[in-house]
A protein has these predicted regions:
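Enzymes that bind and transform nitrogen-containing heteroaromatic metabolites
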Residues: 1-129
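Terminal, non-catalytic protein-protein interaction segments that mediate quaternary/complex assembly
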Residues: 128-437
């Protein structure tokens, strides 16, 4: 707040640190709740370092200044002011501020102008670059999450129940731009899933190493030890026999196997499977039924699950992105994803792009228009050794997301990387984070 606004307060606000912007060198306070700054930039940078929730309460010049610089410093700010230009209240669409380029949540109240409007009118404006869904998730967890321990030995800041809504219209592929993301690796991994292949060496030979650490012989041995410690040797003896036969690179009956061969007994990654339920082909058939008959009971049953309880102990990792559901509405296709566990620094950026791409692919096959991806993260967490990197990422301004082109295909089994083209991806530099295993 400005110095005049601060002086107008009848008392200090509860549970708040008051940052006062004043060029008056004589301004000072002995109260720990009051800190003076020469410039707004200094105040916002300090608040951002402290992961603070920021509210700006005026005066008018401070509101203007905040709108001008907020996007370079902080991702979300709430601004309150009781006296605003009449044009804001009489015509909310004709305001003095540029609301289209600044990330903010701005509440304008005319309570001091009630004689003109018959009461207090409030208008809320929210900047909606879709990448702020992700950046605001980071801030939400850092502010409201709880420090917790977990199996990896690296503590996390955890929040239960978080949601992302990602638009997919106009051939947009959501790839984060506030850090460089290797979208080619995401394409390769998704096709690996869709092919039903559970050998991570297939990815490694293409330069994609993201599954290597979870499929080594050492990891398999540790997996057996953890199962025995958790459940006892008698409880998991049959699963142990299977895991002991895994060669290095074998991921077990994870996503791929469940998507394409649900129910088929898993032997190893070298076995060719011809039985089980092909959930991917089945859901495409169901989507086509619903497209032609909106009243079909299949409309709310377009579900693919990777959570096969009978196979969980045989997997190197239990599925994090557990279940997804498609929705056909007025010629469009949306996808909702239930994710039991989400590593916000490393995993979620991949999941956003991967399931958006999957939705585009299925929509292309079914002759529908992609609309939206909604992700529900049951346990959203930030590893403590990612906090510095993610805090820095929040200060970056998102760029335009790339365009996706997919060749018209009829059969999911005929899909190759040559059918997928990503255009005009631009981003900030790469941010290095270590994966906890």
């Amino acid at each position: 707040m400005g110095n005049n606004t601060f002086k107008s307060l009848t008392k200090l606000l509860d549970n708040r640190i008051h940052y006062v912007i004043s060029h008056n060198t004589e301004s000072k306070s002995d109260n720990d709740q009051v800190i003076y700054f020469d410039t707004l930039s200094e105040a916002l940078i300090q608040a951002n370092k402290n992961n603070a929730k920021i509210s700006v309460i005026g005066g008018v010049q401070l509101i203007y200044d905040t709108l001008n610089i907020a996007h370079t410093i902080y991702t979300k700010i709430t601004m309150y002011h009781s006296i605003v230009p009449l044009s804001v209240e009489s015509d909310p669409d004709n305001v003095y501020f540029d609301f289209t380029k600044v990330p903010h949540h701005f509440i304008l109240s005319s309570k001091n102008l009630g004689e003109f409007f018959g009461g207090c009118n409030i208008h809320t404006y929210t900047y909606t670059h879709p990448e702020y869904e992700y950046l605001n998730l980071i801030q939400d967890i850092l502010c409201d999450g709880k420090l917790t321990q977990n199996r990896t030995g690296v503590n996390t800041i955890t929040k239960v129940g978080c949601t992302l809504r990602i638009p997919l219209a106009s051939n947009v592929l959501p790839v984060l731009t506030t850090k460089k993301v290797n979208y080619n690796h995401i394409v390769t991994e998704l096709l690996w899933f869709l092919n039903g292949d559970t050998n991570s060496k297939t990815l490694s030979t293409q330069g994609v190493k993201i599954w290597d650490d979870n499929t080594t012989r050492e990891f398999h041995a540790n997996r057996i030890n953890k199962l025995v410690t958790t459940y006892g040797s008698e409880r998991v003896k049959d699963d142990i026999k299977i895991i002991e036969q895994y060669n290095e690179g074998d991921a077990g009956p994870i996503y791929h196997h469940q998507w394409r061969h649900w129910g088929a007994e898993y032997v190893n990654c070298d076995t060719i499977y011809t039985t089980g339920i092909d959930q991917i082909k089945r859901v495409i058939e169901q989507i086509n039924i619903v497209k032609n008959d909106p009243l079909s009971p299949e409309g709310r049953r377009l579900i693919v699950s990777a959570w096969n309880v009978s196979d969980l102990d045989k997997m190197v990792l239990n599925p994090c992105h557990t279940l997804f559901q498609f929705h056909v509405l007025d010629g469009t296709l949306s996808c909702t994803l239930y994710q039991r566990s989400g590593d916000v620094g490393l995993g979620i950026p991949y999941n956003i792009t991967s399931y958006a791409l999957l939705t585009h692919i299925i929509a292309t096959i079914a002759g529908l228009v992609p609309k939206e991806l909604v992700i529900f993260i049951a346990n959203a967490h930030i590893y403590t050794d990612h906090v510095t990197q993610l805090t820095m990422q929040q200060t970056r301004e998102p760029m335009v997301w790339p365009t996706l082109l997919i060749n018209k295909i009829q059969d999911i089994d005929n899909l190759t990387e040559n059918d997928i083209t990503v255009l005009n991806y631009k981003s900030h530099s790469h941010i290095k984070m270590k994966m906890a295993v």
